[in-house]
Amino acid sequence: MPASVETSDVISKPEVIVNETITLFCPAAGVPPPEVTWFRDGQALDNQTDDGIVVLDDGWRLHIPHAGISHASRYSCRAENIAGISEKHFDLSVLGNVTTIVIIIIIIIIYYAIGSRQ
């Protein structure tokens, strides 16, 4: 049976807030059981990368414990066996911390309020 990645319950455009944890899932199936490889912007990922990304459970999970803006990328999981290949893509967005956004808005409001008095 060719390798396949179940996609019906998988979010293809996940979002995470800065410094929060996110896990992407790659529910692969096939006979023989497929080998799963993760990619970031087309480059294969090792089991643990320099920027904290960890591949777990024989490739079934990609775990980012403290997401940063630099983690916003296209991630792909590829399930492959002798009968075929299947891929699933995830376009991960990393959103700024709500507190940081509120502070920036307050600074902008103060800046324009002071500027309009002059």
Show the residue positions of the predicted features.
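Immunoglobulin-superfamily
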Residues: 1-102, 118
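Low-complexity, disordered terminal segments
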Residues: 102-115
